[in-house]
Design a protein with these regions (language model features):
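Sec-dependent signal peptide recognition
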Residues: 1-9
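Mature catalytic core of soluble alpha/beta enzymes
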Residues: 4, 15-332
């Protein structure tokens, strides 16, 4: 289960730019969260309607909270023909799963439900290793049967795209805007974002990422600030989403290799890459993997990913790891 950290756009744009494009701002609700979009548009044309229509289409494909969606029907045991959006999300999820050795898995839904993370019904959770072992038999993308674009799930297998769907939504909105000739934009959905070109002042979009703590003064809220151009960014963290039962802290990130909530020293992971769907999924996978394994993966993907990690050492003190490419992007 991915949990985003709030992001803040530091550069406030003027109402118009030197090339007579006008700044348009769209916002709304989607997927249980909010979206905020800014873009430079000739004559100030707004694409709010098209954006909302696209988000509705995405919900109809991959939202587990819409009973009529493709993913919900699959989870109910129907054999159903998928659409382009579903296929895009699924194969991006599989790609990240393969690159991380299975630490990202879109079939973790039974585990998420067991641990009470869907409806925050954590008081009913009884930690039972035997029960978890049984559930684990229903986890794994290999338990999906594909024939052309028709899919059926093995008995008990359930899909959950929550850790990648918002990133995919960002990518699809970006595609929509570019098809309309918009080449300067900042798109944010639930904390995942993508930036292209410049803002109305002709400057690169500048982003602040919050410190992974609820006890930080607003003036000191940012862990780091970076310039973002023609890239996507996603941040995952567990400091806001967890519960304590019998003295044990259970974070909302599930480790699909063990069936248990991730137990490691990571506080937050920020990933920058070309596609927001991949940034979204990798950030979640790295939160499950822990620092050592994440650093090993990054070495193999250093031409694809930029990473900023906040973690604690054995004394509980905050430490950071920044990949070489990410260091060049940070401005504070």
């Amino acid at each position: 289960m991915k949990n985003f950290l709030y992001l803040f756009v530091l550069v406030l744009c003027a109402c118009s730019s030197s090339d007579n494009k006008i700044l348009v701002a769209n916002s709304g609700e989607t997927q249980g969260t909010y979206y905020h979009i800014k873009y430079l548009s000739p004559q100030g044309e707004s694409f709010q309607f098209q954006i909302d229509s696209l988000l509705t289409e995405i919900d109809s494909s991959v939202s587990i909270y819409k009973p009529y969606s493709i993913i919900s029907k699959l989870n109910d045991g129907e054999e159903i023909k998928t659409d382009e959006i579903f296929n895009l999300v699924y194969f991006d999820a599989v790609h990240v799963g393969e690159n991380t050795g299975g630490y990202f898995d879109c079939t973790v839904s039974p585990l998420v439900k067991y641990w009470g993370f869907y409806n925050n019904d954590t008081n009913e959770v009884k930690v039972d290793s035997v029960a978890i072992e049984t559930i684990m038999k229903k986890v794994g993308v290999g338990k999906m049967i594909w024939e052309d674009s028709t899919v059926v799930l093995a008995e008990g297998v359930k899909l959950d795209f929550n850790a990648i769907a918002q990133g995919t939504s960002v990518d699809l909105i970006a595609m929509l805007l570019e098809e309309k000739g918009i080449l300067n934009y900042l798109i944010e959905v639930g904390g995942e974002l993508k930036a292209k070109g410049v803002n109305a002042d002709g400057n690169i979009w500048r982003i602040g990422v919050d410190k992974p703590s609820e006890e930080i003064d607003f003036k000191e809220r940012f862990q780091f600030i970076l310039d973002l151009k023609d890239k996507a960014l996603a941040t995952s963290g567990n400091y806001r989403k967890f519960y304590v039962k019998d003295g044990v802290k259970y974070a909302h990130t599930i480790n699909p290799k063990t069936g248990f909530p991730a137990q490691n020293r990571l506080l937050s992971v920020t990933v920058v890459t070309n596609k927001c769907s991949l940034a979204d999924a990798y950030a979640t996978a790295f939160m499950a993997m822990g620092l050592k394994k994440t650093k090993q993966i990054i070495k193999t993907l250093d031409d694809e990913l930029e990473v900023y990690i906040v973690y604690t050492d054995n004394n509980g003190d905050w430490k950071i790891y920044i990949s070489p490419a990410m260091k060049k992007r940070i401005v504070n």
